[in-house]
Regions:
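P-loop NTP-binding module
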Residues: 3-263
Length: 263
């Protein structure tokens, strides 16, 4: 069993936004089981939002598997202070571990997790393997929802590969930080994969948000996040995210308790 830390409740508005997102996803239809969360660039809040939604589904009695599919640069183990050396997705996809060996129960209600595993130099090739498809088909028989946290899609192809195995996708957009054109690029990639776009979460709405910590950690956004994969894009594009009525979703309040140090 994985013992997770830093999972306490956020502020009231954050919790209500996550409940709204959960309800909207339920309204999308009973056939929706595998849902991916992605973003254009690192640090838009997708990993925290995916975790919060998975936890929220668990709280209402749904059995949920949260899959950390960001094999390049995961944040889950560090953020939730997971101890030991747990197996992960990269080991399963490379044939080192079985599916049973990478699925972990957690100390949270109805929530199991698959962690990313050790860094792999060729994650796109691993994700394209038949083993990933087999895994998704197998866990669909067990869980009510499979929530997949994917890498940001502006720089690498991993997210589009994962999307081809998902029933729906949610794009997380940091308010005021990502251009409309860049979000449309992600949207186009998802459409080409055949994945249904459920909508978007407009994250960190209202107030200013300090980027200096993240620029120091990641370089200038994508440039250092993926090494050679990110240099093509360099610094993230200036501009504002699309209005919420252009890509429907939950507004998550910008508050110190709701901000995520996230990819």
């Amino acid at each position: 069993i994985l013992h997770l830390k830093n999972t306490g409740r956020k502020d009231y508005f954050y919790e209500e936004a996550i409940k709204t997102l959960r309800t909207n996803i339920q309204f999308c239809g009973s056939g929706l089981k595998t849902i991916m969360f992605t973003s254009s660039m690192p640090d838009e809040g997708k990993s925290e939002t995916a975790f919060a939604l998975a936890s929220s589904f668990g709280n209402i009695g749904k059995k949920v598997l949260l899959v950390d599919a960001d094999i390049r640069k995961s944040v889950m183990v560090k953020r939730y202070e997971i101890k030991g050396n747990p197996n992960g997705l990269s080991q399963y996809l490379s044939g080192q571990k079985s599916l049973e060996e990478i699925c972990y129960e957690t100390d949270m209600e109805n929530l199991d997790m698959v962690l990313s595993g050790p860094f792999s130099p060729n994650p796109a090739e691993l994700l394209e393997d038949e083993l990933f498809k087999t895994m998704i088909e197998s866990v669909k028989e067990i869980y009510d929802y499979i929530i997949i946290d994917t890498p940001p899609m502006a720089n690498v192809i991993d997210g589009a590969i994962i999307a081809s195995q998902c029933d729906g996708a949610v794009i997380v957009i940091e308010s005021g930080a990502i251009s409309y054109r860049l979000v449309q690029k992600v949207r186009s990639q998802l459409e080409k994969s055949g994945c249904r776009i459920l909508g978007a979460v407009l994250n960190r709405v209202g107030g200013g948000y300090e980027h200096s910590y993240y620029e120091k950690y990641y370089g200038r956004r994508g440039g250092k996040y993926y090494g050679k994969y990110g240099r093509h894009y360099g610094r993230y594009e200036e501009g504002k995210a699309p209005p919420v009525n252009e890509v429907s979703g939950a507004r998550i309040k910008n508050d110190t308790t709701a901000q995520s140090q996230d990819t």
